[in-house]
Amino acid sequence: MMVLDKEDGVPMLSVQPKGKQKGCAGCNRKIKDRYLLKALDKYWHEDCLKCACCDCRLGEVGSTLYTKANLILCRRDYLRLFGTTGNCAACSKLIPAFEMVMRARDNVYHLDCFACQLCNQRFCVGDKFFLKNNMILCQMDYEEGQLNGTFESQVQ
């Protein structure tokens, strides 16, 4: 049985070592169960791990929880509170709040859309890219444009 935290993708279920009972973050009582639920670096009884808005139980098998702003939320309340992250600067389509994104200055992109706008080379976290007139460019296309006098430096 494995329950995952959607924000971090880390397992929320672990076996409690014998003799060292953890305290529940919800009720402050010792957790005597064999398995521990962990969310926001705290331990919970199955009945105590609930959505901060609607109080629905999130400790059951198959449940999914979301964390943001130190809140533990069910999917419905997460989407209701945090909605969307806006529109993708490349394709203009809506980006759901729970989707991973790439950011460049004030622009937000789907992971699949975060690419050089001239050659379509995709970027990963840590890759060097250049931003000119809200256009994302790879190093090769940027340097070529700079040699031609097309672009001035705005390294990210």
Curated annotation (Swiss-Prot):
Subcellular localization(s) per the UniProt record: Nucleus
Tissue expression notes: Expressed mainly in the central nervous. Low level of expression in other tissues including thymus.
Residues covered by the LIM zinc-binding domain: 24-83, 88-147
Keyword tags: Chromosomal rearrangement, LIM domain, Metal-binding, Nucleus, Proto-oncogene, Repeat, Zinc
Stated role: May be involved in gene regulation within neural lineage cells potentially by direct DNA binding or by binding to other transcription factors.
PANTHER family, per the entry: LD11652P, RHOMBOTIN-1
The name this protein goes by in its record: Rhombotin-1
Organism: Homo sapiens (Human)
Lineage, opening ranks: Eukaryota, Metazoa, Chordata, Craniata, Vertebrata
Name of the gene encoding the protein in the UniProt record: LMO1
